[in-house]
Amino acid sequence: MFGNDVSRAAREHALSEWPRESCGVVSGGVYHPILNIAANPLNGFEIDARVWLDHAPEAVIHSHDASTVTGADGRPRPRHPHHPSRADMASQIAAGVPFGIVSTDGEAVSDVLWWGDHVLSEPLEGRTFLPGVRDCYALVRAWYFQRRGVMLADFARDDGWWSAGENMLVDGFAEAGFVPVDGPLQEGDVFFARAGSPVPSHSGVVLDGGLILHHHTGLSGCEPLGRWLHRITHWVRHAP
């Protein structure tokens, strides 16, 4: 998205700030390190509002601590995963510019993971699953953007939101411009389905020929609708 100099500078900044989260902005094609003013910089970042006036950021990059901890299941995991949190997503949606994450354990450091509305233009099939970036709802948004020229609302979300008492798809479909389907299905209709979850946690788009486009795990792609009928709980249609 930006040149190697931006990536290199952001990665070096992340290493120098670890275990605190680093943050910076890209302005004029150059990475500018910014002071993280969050109350708890080990677990989040905050940028002074004046930065937006001084730099007119084209993008924001921050770091995640990838050092190994023991999860609730007793297995090792990174302290913060290499994908955006709900707070990260909310900040990106509000800012309206691309955001990036670099993950480091203080020694190794990842490449920049970019996300934002530019992902809408990526190919619809063959996407690698990544929570909040390339997941089922992200694919629905991308299909509507590419095939209908419609920009659906995005929703900040944590991985596993469905197991935390939330019902994002059902609660949010009206805000995204959808209404319940009454009648035969049409191309572009969207389904909600339970995928081993107490509430609908998966969505996809109906295509012609009895197919659906969806992104459950692995790579996004098409498959026959019939394979998912027993899991589907809702059908909705976009109402321009």
Q: What kind of feature is each model-predicted range?
A:
Residues 130-147:
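Active-site nucleophilic cysteine motif
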Residues 150-161:
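Short acidic alpha-helical/loop segments enriched in Asp/Glu that coordinate divalent cations
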Residues 100-102, 215, 238:
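Generic beta-sheet signal
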Residues 124-130:
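Second-shell loop/turn segments in exported
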Residues 119-120:
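Extracytoplasmic and endomembrane cell-envelope/extracellular-matrix remodeling and assembly machinery
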Residues 1-58, 66-116:
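Conserved beta-strand-loop surface patch within small alpha/beta domains used
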